[in-house]
């Protein structure tokens, strides 16, 4: 019986310990009955003394608030995607790239399972869980703190007091997934397609009480912002697990490639027997000092890959082939399949890529084929079982005319294009893309509405969206006045949209969200007034990207200007740069320094320096730390100014 606050605190600590052993270590210390008894005693004390409730008490995991929607939440540091490798050759190619960048092969690999769930970012400050965010687009997610607190394997309090982002995957056991679907069937509710959908859907419930009923598990796999000082990723993760998080099986360190391949084989064998869904193995360079040297592409860190499991394959029949027309006019053949279940998902369609591929594989309607599905990759046909042919299979001819507008197509071999800019499919898909989440994000303007607007002659180009009137929309099927007003207001609200969203919405080939942000940071809204060679200066922009931008601007200059006049996009806020000896200079960092290189890089960039990854005659300074390598030698050879890290700090202090 709890008599006073001291008894209460002891009871809470005991409950925390029991919960940790049960949910994290899978090693219960007491019976469920004993746990429930103490839990209810703690609850009773808290009801009588609401002013003395410990916020980290297990009873506080579930709140009574039902949200109207989720607030957007900006991650303290970006949550990157991961490059996928699907076989030994792909993996060896990645290792080869790492060796080339580092200039040696003195590194090891940290290995861990790749869970097939929903990514979550936890932020702890002063040891308390202050926020939990979904991955979102990698920079901005949704605040799901109340739901995350209901997951028993997420500690509400940790011993690490510094600000830290702990990242991981929310998953559900396969058995629990089956039980959940059985329950939903009984209640007449739609079932979840697979455990990942169940985990993601449970995490995004507006009522935390529903999330609390779902047996979700959280496995950490990394960190974002942190002030930890570890030399190896494996040591860093050892520390994270010591904070009270659930540790996955089979993680470890490999010194060489044969060890990695052996681990991969072990994971493949573990795949079916493991309690939650795995879709591969994550391989990271263990030495943290090499992470900054390896750097990042526009999407991925170069120091890690997801070594995916072999795809699951099934046999089925091609019942038909339809041809889709994208916003760029490319005709893509898609196989309509006899429905087949692959890895818990019903597959009814598979990409055929292009008509050259159809001819190469001799694919016909009516063929028995092998279809594979791997992770998020669109299902595809890998083999035609020609020996099962009966003679009534139909060849698939190359189209000579667009299946949507009837215009003659341009056949370039692998690509067949409809060149009619007014083709309904091209126009509708352009509108859908323009309004999509990572572009203008116009609420209520999805595929069905875009088709309606086009079919009723209200929109022939994205610029027409801004001429829409409530009275015109009211005449459309299923458009009541309120819905019409909402759409018009949603479109009008995009005036003053961020520059990068505007550029991304233009749909320039090879230019996605990350590239759009770089264009806006460099040139702002008037990017279209700059010469092609100026785009070459942007880090990561290759010849194809530059050519694509130049061609788009040449053809669409008037349209860009009209949209700018309508939307008045906002340029990124320019940070006020304090004048330093490095302002406007090109700098290269090399060697091990007293602070993480990423920190020094950001500091220099905030001062207006351009921090490059390679040394050339245009480099102003090479700043070196301990064990400086080939960049130091190259700078010496080219006569580039060499500064030790101490010299850098001295120059900053003296301001010269």
Curated annotation (Swiss-Prot):
Function: DNA ligase that catalyzes the formation of phosphodiester linkages between 5'-phosphoryl and 3'-hydroxyl groups in double-stranded DNA using NAD as a coenzyme and as the energy source for the reaction. It is essential for DNA replication and repair of damaged DNA.
NCBIfam families: dnlj, PRK07956.1
Name of the protein described by the UniProt record: DNA ligase
Active site residues of this protein: 114
GO biological process: DNA repair; DNA replication
Keyword set includes Transcription: no
Family: Belongs to the NAD-dependent DNA ligase family. LigA subfamily.
Cofactor or coenzyme needed: Mg(2+); Mn(2+)
Binding residues for NAD(+): 32-36, 81-82, 112, 135, 169, 284, 308
Gene Ontology cellular-component annotations: cytosol
Organism of derivation: Nautilia profundicola (strain ATCC BAA-1463 / DSM 18972 / AmH)
Cross-referenced Pfam families: BRCT (PF00533), DNA_ligase_aden (PF01653), DNA_ligase_OB (PF03120), DNA_ligase_ZBD (PF03119), HHH_5 (PF14520)
Gene3D superfamilies in the cross-refs: 5' to 3' exonuclease, C-terminal subdomain, 6.20.10.30, BRCT domain, DNA ligase/mRNA capping enzyme, Helix hairpin bin, Nucleic acid-binding proteins
Transmembrane segments: none
Top-rank taxon, per record: Bacteria
Keywords, sorted A to Z: DNA damage, DNA repair, DNA replication, Ligase, Magnesium, Manganese, Metal-binding, NAD, Zinc
Reaction(s) the record says it catalyses: NAD(+) + (deoxyribonucleotide)n-3'-hydroxyl + 5'-phospho-(deoxyribonucleotide)m = (deoxyribonucleotide)n+m + AMP + beta-nicotinamide D-nucleotide
């Amino acid at each position: 019986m709890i008599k006073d606050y001291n008894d209460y605190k002891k009871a809470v600590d005991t409950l925390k310990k029991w919960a940790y052993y049960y949910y994290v270590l899978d090693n219960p210390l007491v019976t469920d009955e004993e746990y429930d008894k103490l839990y209810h005693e703690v609850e009773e004390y808290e009801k009588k003394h609401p002013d003395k409730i410990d916020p980290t008490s297990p009873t506080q995991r579930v709140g009574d608030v039902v949200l109207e929607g989720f607030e957007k939440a900006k991650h303290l540091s970006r949550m990157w995607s991961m490059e996928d490798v699907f076989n030994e050759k792909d993996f060896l190619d990645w290792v080869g790239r790492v060796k080339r960048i580092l200039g040696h092969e003195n590194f090891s690999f940290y290995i861990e399972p790749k869970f097939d769930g929903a990514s979550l970012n936890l932020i702890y400050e002063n040891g308390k869980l202050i926020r939990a965010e979904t991955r979102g687009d990698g920079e901005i997610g949704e605040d799901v703190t109340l739901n995350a607190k209901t997951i028993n394997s997420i500690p509400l309090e940790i011993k690490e007091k510094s600000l830290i982002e702990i990242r991981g995957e929310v998953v559900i056991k396969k058995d629990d997934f089956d039980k959940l679907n059985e329950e939903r069937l009984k209640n007449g509710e739609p079932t979840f397609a697979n455990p990942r959908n169940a985990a993601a859907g449970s995490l995004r419930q507006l009522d935390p009480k529903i999330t609390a009923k779902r047996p979700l598990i959280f496995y950490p796999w990394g960190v974002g912002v942190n002030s930890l000082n570890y030399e190896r990723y494996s040591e860093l993760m050892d520390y994270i697990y010591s904070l009270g998080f659930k540790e996955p099986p089979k993680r470890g360190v490999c010194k060489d490639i044969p060890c990695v391949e052996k681990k991969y084989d072990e994971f493949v064998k573990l795949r079916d027997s493991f309690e939650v869904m795995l879709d591969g193995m994550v391989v990271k360079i263990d030495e943290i000092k090499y992470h900054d040297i390896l750097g990042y592409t526009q999407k991925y860190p170069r120091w890690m890959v997801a070594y995916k499991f072999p795809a699951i394959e099934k046999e089925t029949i091609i019942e038909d082939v339809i041809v889709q027309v994208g916003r760029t006019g490319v005709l893509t053949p898609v196989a309509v399949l006899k429905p087949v279940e692959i890895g818990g998902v019903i597959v009814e369609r598979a990409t055929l890529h292009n008509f050259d591929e159809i001819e190469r594989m001799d694919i016909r309607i009516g063929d028995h084929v092998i279809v594979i599905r791997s992770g998020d990759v669109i299902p595809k046909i890998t083999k035609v079982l020609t020996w099962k042919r009966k003679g009534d299979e139909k060849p698939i001819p190359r189209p000579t005319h667009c299946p949507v507008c009837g215009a003659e197509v341009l056949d370039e071999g692998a690509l067949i294009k409809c060149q009619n800019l007014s083709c309904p499919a091209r126009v509708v898909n352009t509108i859908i893309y323009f309004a999509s989440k990572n572009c203008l994000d116009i609420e209520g303007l999805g595929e069905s509405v875009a088709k309606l607007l086009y079919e009723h002659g209200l929109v022939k180009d994205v610029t027409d969206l801004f001429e829409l009137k409530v009275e015109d929309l009211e005449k459309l099927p299923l458009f009541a006045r309120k819905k019409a007003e909402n759409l018009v207001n949603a479109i009008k609200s995009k005036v003053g949209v961020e520059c990068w969203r505007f550029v991304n919405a233009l749909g320039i080939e090879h230019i996605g969200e990350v590239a759009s942000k770089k264009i806006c940071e460099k040139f702002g809204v008037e990017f279209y007034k700059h010469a092609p060679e100026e785009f070459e200066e942007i880090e990561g922009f290759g010849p194809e990207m530059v050519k694509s931008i130049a061609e788009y601007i040449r053809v669409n200059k008037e349209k860009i200007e009209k949209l700018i006049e309508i939307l008045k996009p906002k340029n990124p806020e320019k940070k006020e740069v304090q004048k330093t000896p490095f302002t406007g200079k090109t700098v290269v960092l090399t060697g091990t320094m007293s602070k993480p290189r990423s920190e020094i890089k950001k500091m220099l960039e905030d001062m207006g320096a351009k921090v490059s990854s390679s040394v050339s005659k245009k480099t102003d300074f090479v700043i070196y730390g301990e064990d400086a390598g080939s960049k130091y030698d190259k700078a010496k050879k080219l006569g580039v100014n060499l500064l030790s890290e101490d010299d850098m700090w001295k120059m900053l202090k003296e301001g010269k």
